[in-house]
Design a protein with these regions (language model features):
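Conserved SGNH/GDSL esterase-like catalytic core that processes O-acyl groups on lipids
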Residues: 231, 324-330, 334-338, 345-349, ...
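N-terminal secretory targeting modules
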Residues: 3-8, 12, 18-32, 154-351, ...
């Protein structure tokens, strides 16, 4: 009864071996012309005019300078860019590559000669070409005509931690950065030097590898980080506790101590750290002695508690018993967090103002507290995770309280849109609920003619980067201090334009109907807004429930 071994099988003979697949060569970079339609003023108070002409050229008269967006959002320090500007100007001009008007990263040349090609290395964030008069203290530039700008991008870096086939990075959490050192409720943390700051974020998708982007965009000096750790938050969202068994060191270029240079955004190394969707992660940072006290980059409307203690407590389980503990509801130097996901994963950016930022979700006079995660974006993320077809869709909240297209609190919406949409990983959708802060007690409807071109630029930028745009008509505000007949008229013009085919949006998300009083659609329902009239404090869940999830299914 001893089993007989199966006879050996003979390998087939003369079967040709397939040649190994050849990898397609990476095409050499070529120069191409920038789209000039996004040209804008460098400074908000510039009274001159910039005109995009029908032939695609752009002209300016009596302006302080001009910003032209670059079309590569993946430029990093060390990359080489070649630029040729064609046109003419009334005066000698100088050129910069810049983050925005106030943060120049690399000077192209001074002066800049039209038709000449300049090659230079990126030394900071690169979003725009900035053109202005050569002399610092000169009067406005009388005239400038740009017929074409040619660019060639030469990537000069090695990809860190390459991913296996079928995988990619997708941002799972993000926030809109702004200067915060003078903001109530946040400024009590300044100075940050030689303190530990524990910040809590809630991820919206799952992954087993993790990385952070850290921003010092508004700082004029470097941020010194002595140590940074991440860990799962403990059982209660309103406490500083961490699960110490998950405590993990964060490094940059392999170093536990590092700096975030002035005006720059850096990326951490890949962290082996598994997260589950809707889980809270604690980011604990011990700052060194050099941290800016002005131009502090952060976000004042976290709606989540941040903890600060003296000394290095990054691995301490609970900060509640540490002497000198402070709390606030803001974030510092965090831009976003990403996880590795399958290739079909994607992110949606919620771009807006205080309504998107969740104003009122921590309103003490209504019995509300921080750490509730009840912004409309939070409810939206929960719905996406409850739907099998959208579990791989993350939510990034890019709302800033008091923000407007033309200014308001924080960086103007028209200036930050590019950063807040394109600098995240894996963005496939954008929801725009924005503009109410531009409608404060208007006397007539002429503001519509200023706002419409800015919306058009936002929509065009998204489409140029294969991002679907869903417009959310501006919510009613009839019982707020903003209301006037002119303001209501502009709201209706914007909303009707969004709903028309002329706008070019890919769909409408009707938050307006979800929160409007059916008996008086100019007002938000009383049970949602209470005495505010503008913010739907208790209507954020109704807003999220109004979103058709099929719009986010592939």
């Amino acid at each position: 009864n001893v089993p007989t071994a199966a006879p050996a099988t003979k390998a087939p003979e003369n079967v040709p071996t397939a040649a190994p697949a050849t990898k397609e060569p990476t095409p050499a970079p070529v120069a191409h012309a920038l789209d000039l339609s996004g040209a804008s003023h460098i400074y908000m108070n510039d009274s001159g005019t910039i005109t995009v002409n029908s032939d695609g050229t752009v002209s300016g008269s009596n302006i302080q300078g001009m910003l032209i967006p670059l079309d590569d959002t993946d430029l990093e320090v060390g990359d080489i860019v070649e630029i040729t500007v064609h046109g003419s100007a009334s005066d000698s001009i100088r050129g910069w590559i810049s983050t925005d008007a106030d943060n120049r990263a690399s000077e192209i040349t001074n002066p800049l000669n039209f038709g000449q090609t300049y090659s230079f290395e990126i030394t900071g964030n690169a979003n725009y070409i900035q053109l202005k008069k050569k002399s610092y203290n000169a009067s406005d530039l009388s005239s400038i005509n740009i017929t074409k700008i040619e660019v060639k991008y030469l990537k000069n870096r090695v990809e860190k931690d390459p991913l296996p086939d079928g995988k990619k990075w997708v941002t799972t959490w993000g926030t809109a950065e702004e200067p915060v050192e003078n903001q109530d409720g946040v400024k009590n943390f300044i100075p940050l030097a030689k303190t530990t700051v524990r910040q809590i974020i809630q991820v919206t998708t799952s992954g087993d590898k993790f990385k952070l982007r850290l921003s010092n965009q508004y700082g004029k000096s470097s941020v010194q980080v002595e140590s940074m750790h991440i860990a799962k938050q403990g059982a209660r969202a309103d406490q500083s506790d961490i699960i110490t068994s998950t405590d993990t060191v964060v490094t940059v270029d392999g170093k536990e101590s590092f700096e975030i240079p002035a005006g720059e955004v850096i990326e951490t190394d890949t962290i082996d750290f598994k997260v589950t969707a809707l889980e809270n992660v604690a980011i604990s940072t011990y700052f060194g002695g050099n941290v800016p006290t002005t131009g502090v980059t952060g976000h004042r409307g976290a709606r989540a508690t941040t903890y600060q203690t003296p000394g290095n407590e990054v691995s301490t389980e609970s900060l509640g018993s540490v002497n000198g503990l402070k709390t606030c509801t803001g974030w510092f130097f965090l831009a976003d967090a990403s996880v590795v996901m399958d290739d079909d994963a994607r992110a949606v950016v919620c771009f807006g103002d205080s309504i998107t930022d969740g104003y009122g979700t921590d309103a003490g006079y209504l019995g509300k507290k921080p750490d509730s995660y009840t912004r409309w974006g939070d409810y939206f993320a929960k719905r996406l995770q409850a739907n099998e077809s959208t579990k791989n869709v993350s939510v990034i909240n890019e709302g800033i309280g008091g923000n407007a297209i033309f200014g308001g609190l924080g960086p103007a919406g028209k200036d930050r849109f590019r950063r807040d949409i394109l600098e995240h990983d894996g963005v496939a959708y954008c929801i725009i609920l924005f503009g109410v802060n531009d409608l404060d007690k208007l006397q007539n409807t002429s503001k519509f003619n200023q706002l419409k071109p800015e919306y058009e630029k936002m929509i065009a930028l998204c489409h140029a980067n294969n991002i679907k745009v869903y417009a959310a008509p501006i919510l009613p505000f009839g019982k707020s201090g903003y209301y006037s007949e002119g303001s209501e008229g502009v709201r209706q013009l914007i909303n009707n334009w969004f709903r028309s085919t002329e706008s070019g949006v890919d769909g409408i998300i009707d938050f307006e109907s979800a929160v409007a009083d059916p008996d008086n659609p100019k007002n938000v329902r009383e049970e949602y807004t209470h005495s505010d009239g503008l913010h739907p404090y208790d209507g954020y869940e109704a807003m999220a429930n109004a979103i058709d999830l099929e719009m986010f299914e592939k």
